[in-house]
Amino acid sequence: MNTALAQQIANEGGVEAWMIAQQHKSLLRFLTCGSVDDGKSTLIGRLLHDTRQIYEDQLSSLHNDSKRHGTQGEKLDLALLVDGLQAEREQGITIDVAYRYFSTEKRKFIIADTPGHEQYTRNMATGASTCELAILLIDARKGVLDQTRRHSFISTLLGIKHLVVAINKMDLVDYSEETFTRIREDYLTFAGQLPGNLDIRFVPLSALEGDNVASQSESMPWYSGPTLLEVLETVEIQRVVDAQPMRFPVQYVNRPNLDFRGYAGTLASGRVEVGQRVKVLPSGVESNVARIVTFDGDREEAFAGEAITLVLTDEIDISRGDLLLAADEALPAVQSASVDVVWMAEQPLSPGQSYDIKIAGKKTRARVDGIRYQVDINNLTQREVENLPLNGIGLVDLTFDEPLVLDRYQQNPVTGGLIFIDRLSNVTVGAGMVHEPVSQATAAPSEFSVFELELNALVRRHFPHWGARDLLGDK
């Protein structure tokens, strides 16, 4: 067992007390990104090492691996802690997204170590999609590079508002304050082009030597700010979904017996309480929340991010992919949207193509009407293109086969994020972030009775070969 972990358990008074304490700590998900060989994996290894999160057998194995694959001479190569693939160790680069967990007395952390190479942009986007903070590493010898700009843009595109610019390898520039100041000014000039209201912080450090990572550096007396670990422990993450209106995508209809019918899913945003009047979209039927069922028993209210089962007072037609929201909220269904797309397939995305898409538990089809532009993510300029290639990022116009209830991705990642699925191979070929829902469905729910809508839904669900049209979306 890790000696530090054993000491923590002893201080808490046993394993059970330690586990309870862990549950009540806040969790921060962050990623490390930057140019090739800026020291991302070394930084994570240093964090794990200096916070005493490495087990004794791992440390022994690290000594052996450092002799075989290490790049730091006689020193421990801490990057090998996270470069787990054999190809990564042999090439000295990161290819896949590596996830690591560690905790301190103040907070729990999940780290995503993302690749820096341009051909692995899709891997980096995947890692960033679940994170709340990004550490952007910059080599003090090289300054701000194209890949630094690219990763900054992708991070902000995926909704990350907190950026920590870690200027690494300060030991190789004699811990120069002038170098740090110059790089800081260069990055701030570039950051003016990034979207959103960003929280940007700068930390000069040396991941190899441990300067300003978990402890203050004696080699940089001119820097009086917090260490990287102190920033991670104290940064306040304001979750956007907490302040957004209620959104509950139904993932599963739970009917274990004749006496129970519940709708299971994760509350995407807002809060819900017993007795609240809710509306089901796209049908528009309303009901009241009778119970909120959780693993720990019934609750009176639930909040964003919690997995719950809702029981309604009325038996109405609700299926996987439907969305529950407050009854007094007017949120129209749309059949078109402009979407920021990160393309992940060898075959380019072209106008006229159709794909299965999945959004908030609902699966339908979408047609690519056009590509407005592709972003040159090295300088953030926009250019017209005929198709979107592998690792390309651009703004695309989509038309859906049926009305969907969408939010902008920056407001709600669950109801604003989607994936593209190839209809033949069933492989995920792209990720999309709703930029703007652009047109309303024209059918009015009041033109059909509740019975007609439920019968139509029943036929389409159980007899798809009949080709019945959607009464709400095909008019």
Swiss-Prot record:
Which one GO biological process term can you cite for this protein?
A: sulfate assimilation
* Stretch list, region G5: 206-208
UniProt KW keywords: ATP-binding, GTP-binding, Nucleotide-binding, Nucleotidyltransferase, Transferase
| Superkingdom of origin | Bacteria
Its EC number is: 2.7.7.4
Q: A single GO molecular function, which one?
A: ATP binding
Q: Where is this region: G2?
A: 92-96
Please list where the region (G4) is annotated.
168-171
Q: Where is this region: G1?
A: 34-41
Q: Which reaction does it catalyse?
A: sulfate + ATP + H(+) = adenosine 5'-phosphosulfate + diphosphate
Signal peptide residues are: none
Q: Which PROSITE patterns match?
A: G_TR_1, G_TR_2
Q: In which pathway does it act?
A: Sulfur metabolism; hydrogen sulfide biosynthesis; sulfite from sulfate: step 1/3
Which residues hold GTP?
34-41, 113-117, 168-171
Which enzyme class, named as a word? transferase
Instruction: Please give the InterPro entries that the UniProt record associates with this protein.
Output: CysN_GTP-bd (IPR041757), CysN_II (IPR044138), CysN_NoDQ_III (IPR044139), G_TR_CS (IPR031157), GTP-eEF1A_C (IPR054696), P-loop_NTPase (IPR027417), Small_GTP-bd (IPR005225), SO4_adenylTrfase_lsu (IPR011779)
Q: Where is this region: G3?
A: 113-116
Enumerate the spans annotated as tr-type G domain: 25-239
Assembly, in brief, is: Heterodimer composed of CysD, the smaller subunit, and CysN.
Family statement drawn from the similarity comment of this UniProt entry: Belongs to the TRAFAC class translation factor GTPase superfamily. Classic translation factor GTPase family. CysN/NodQ subfamily.
- According to its UniProt entry, what is the function of this protein? With CysD forms the ATP sulfurylase (ATPS) that catalyzes the adenylation of sulfate producing adenosine 5'-phosphosulfate (APS) and diphosphate, the first enzymatic step in sulfur assimilation pathway. APS synthesis involves the formation of a high-energy phosphoric-sulfuric acid anhydride bond driven by GTP hydrolysis by CysN coupled to ATP hydrolysis by CysD.
Task: Name the chain's protein.
Answer: Sulfate adenylyltransferase subunit 1
Natural source organism:
Escherichia coli O9:H4 (strain HS)
